[in-house]
Swiss-Prot record:
One of its GO terms (cellular component) is cytoplasm. It catalyses: Fe(III)-enterobactin + 3 H2O + H(+) = Fe(III)-[N-(2,3-dihydroxybenzoyl)-L-serine] + 2 N-(2,3-dihydroxybenzoyl)-L-serine; Fe(III)-enterobactin + H2O = Fe(III)-[N-(2,3-dihydroxybenzoyl)-L-serine]3 + H(+); Fe(III)-[N-(2,3-dihydroxybenzoyl)-L-serine]3 + H2O + H(+) = Fe(III)-[N-(2,3-dihydroxybenzoyl)-L-serine]2 + N-(2,3-dihydroxybenzoyl)-L-serine; Fe(III)-[N-(2,3-dihydroxybenzoyl)-L-serine]2 + H2O + H(+) = Fe(III)-[N-(2,3-dihydroxybenzoyl)-L-serine] + N-(2,3-dihydroxybenzoyl)-L-serine. Disruption phenotype: Disruption of the gene abrogates enterochelin-supported growth on iron-chelated media. Keywords: Cytoplasm, Hydrolase. The keyword Hydrolase applies. The lineage of its organism: Bacteria, Pseudomonadati, Pseudomonadota, Gammaproteobacteria, Enterobacterales. Its main location: cytoplasm. Its EC number is 3.1.1.108. This is Iron(III) enterobactin esterase. It is an enzyme of class 3 (hydrolase). InterPro entries: AB_hydrolase_fold, Enterochelin_esterase_N, Ig-like_fold, Ig_E-set, Mycobacterial_A85_antigen.
Amino acid sequence: MKSRGLSVSTTNEHPDSQRLLADPLAGSESWWQQIAQWGTPLVEPISEDKVRLTFLWREPVAGADEPTYSRVYIDVNGVTDHHSTHPETLQRLGQTHVWYWQAEVESDFRGSYSFMPVTAEHCLNLPEGTPQERRQAQRNWWISLMDLAQNDPFNHTAPHSSYRGRPLSAVHLADAIPQTAWQPIDAGQQLPTDTQRLQLITWHSELLGNSRNVWIYHTHGTEDNAERPLAILLDGQYWATRQPIFGVLDNETDAGRLPASVYVLIDIIDQPHRSVELPCNQDFWQALQTELLPQVAALQPFTDQASRTVVAGQSFGWVGLAICRITLAAAFWWCAESSPVPSGGRMLIISKL
C-alpha cells in the first residue's frame, strides 16, 4: 500500500514534546499556532536510528449540540495493531482540548495514519463468546469506526484516502527510502492523465460469474510492444479513481526509472467480492490468467516472461498475490496473528511455510 511525505520545519533543530506538553499555555491559540508552524507529528531523534513521534489532535470546543469525546483512537500503519482488543488511544492533556499519543519508530519509517474520535457508545465493548466470535466482533467494531476517521489538519502534506475512502495523513521520515515519484502528489499537485493511452473495459468472467471494470494503461517507450513488462494492480479502482497513478507512472517512465510497460488495474466490484476473491481464491487467479489477460493482450501486447511480470496489492491484495506465488516459492514468511508489533514500528516475521 503507498504513503505520503512529511517535512517538519522548526525554529529550533527539533521540537521538544515534553516541554510543549508541560507548557502552562498548552491548548491555547498561540500554542496551537506553534504546532501548526512545526507540523505534526512532532519528530524528535532519540538515538542514531530511532525517533519519537508525537501525534496531536485538537478537540473541537463542544457546544450544546456537539458530542463529548471519550476516546480518540489512532491507527498508524505498521505501528499500531488494529486487531487488538486494547487498541491505541490518545491521552487527553489535563483539562485541555489537547489529545496526544507518542511512539518510537525507526528513523526510516514511512506510514499513513488517521484519528478516530468517538463518544462513549462507540468505545470497544466486546461481548462474551468464543475467541473467534470475539475476533469477529472486534473486526466489525473496527470497521464501524472508518466513517469516523479523520486526517491530521496539522500535517504539512496533502491528505489522501485509503481504498475504503478513509481519510489519511502520513509520516515520511528523513531516512526513509526516497519516493520522488509521489512528491508532486504530496505537495497537492494533480498530475495529468493521457486519456489517449487509457482504456476502460468490462471484464465479464464466466468462471467467476460476475463483471467488473478493468483499466488498461501503457506508458511511452521504444521497446517492442510484445516485449513490454506487465504490471497488475489489485484494488485497481483505488489507483484509477481515488489516487490516480497514471501521471506518476508517466513521470517515472520519462525519467528512465521505469520501463515502458502495460498496467492492468482490476476493480474489486465491492467489499464482499474483495473478501472472497483476493485471499486464497484459485478461481480468481485462474480467471485472470485464462479470461482477462488474453483480452488485455489483444488490446495492448505484453511479454509472457514471468520475470517481467509484477502483481501488486495490499492487505487482502497482498494475500492474493502471495497465494499467486506461494506454490513456486522455496520459502514463504509471514507474521503470525499472535505476534506483537514492536515499538520500532516493524512487524516481526516469525513464521515459515
